[in-house]
Amino acid sequence: ASILHLNISKIKSKYILVFLIIAVYFVTIKFHYRYNVDRKFLDIESVNKKNAINAEILSPKMKHLKWVTPYTDPNEEIEVIKKAIQIIGLDKRKKVLITHYQFLSVILNEDLNLLNRWYLWGNDTHPTETHKYFNFYKKMVNENIKRNEIEVIYILSQENEILFKHVKNYFTAKCFNSKNIFDNKFSYHEIISCKK
């Protein structure tokens, strides 16, 4: 559509112009239904959306939204997230949250010092140890931890999806007191002084 708009004055035939405008209109409608209405671009493309539940049970801020997941029972996932919200909300220390659930900072009305939008190993969402920018990323993570005086790192994901053993290598000269809170889905890792 933008290319057509830029070149519209160069098109001499009214028939070609009308054809192109109609074609752009129908293509726009087709893609709207496919990608916006049917959500073909998301991981929930093949999920039965009839299993969706009201997301408002997580927070009033999610009123009018539905929750559906490709991983597990939506109710089970909501329970884990609710428990995480409760624990993270009560913890007044400065923290980092490593998760795909980016909306938690909005629900908690708190800066959770999110490092990435998402974490998918082997999918180039962030540099892993074999990536040429790993040391640059690691330095950035450690500078953020120091600058923001982070005391604890929380991890919230699907079961065994984001494991601390995969994340730990980003933290230089740090020791942790770790606890798995909920079935390898939710854990915390308190930064402690290393014993010499």
Stretches found by the model and what they are:
Residues T72, D124-Y133, N160-H166:
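Short, flexible/disordered intra-domain loops and linkers
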Residues L108, L112-I150:
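Extended hydrophobic/aromatic segments used for targeting, binding, or gating
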Residues I85-I88, V141-N142, K168:
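Short amphipathic alpha-helical segments and helix-helix/interface helices
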Residues E77-A84, Y133-M140, L163-F164:
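Well-ordered, non-membrane alpha-helical segments in soluble/globular domains
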Residues Y33-D38, K49-G122, E151-N160:
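Short periplasmic/luminal acceptor-recognition loop of GT-C membrane glycosyltransferases, typified by
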Residues N148-K196:
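Aromatic/acidic, Gly/Pro-rich catalytic loop(s) in extracytoplasmic/lumenal soluble domains
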Residues L20-A23, N116-Y119, F182:
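Residues at the C-termini of beta-strands that transition into short coil/loop
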Residues A1-L42:
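Signature aromatic-anchored transmembrane alpha helix within multi-pass, membrane-resident enzymes
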